[in-house]
Amino acid sequence: MFETSSEKPAPVRVVTEAIKEYLDRLGPIWIEGEISELNERSGGMAFIRLRDTSADMSLSVMCYKTVLASVQPLPPNARVVIHAKASWYTKSGTLTMSAKEIRQVGVGELLA
């Protein structure tokens, strides 16, 4: 990592590149949550809002519809584990989670 101060701040490019390097080293991870939103788009992509099962936190995950098809049909608020890889786009400072596998583990407790 690098050291910064008000006298020696890090340029945006250095910070965004450091975030990208860290996330690239992290590799794919398994994430558990409840699907609170599911939007299937034309073009083969789907976007999932994954909500924590015990805290008021959520995360956006994108996947190909073929990945989603392996667990269809999903009941409302399905509880799932998702194998995903985080990617950081340095130009825009955007974090994207891309699902490679989804497994249903039960029906969640989220009430709409």
Residue positions per predicted region:
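Acidic, two-metal ion nucleic-acid-processing modules in DNA metabolism proteins
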Residues: 1-112
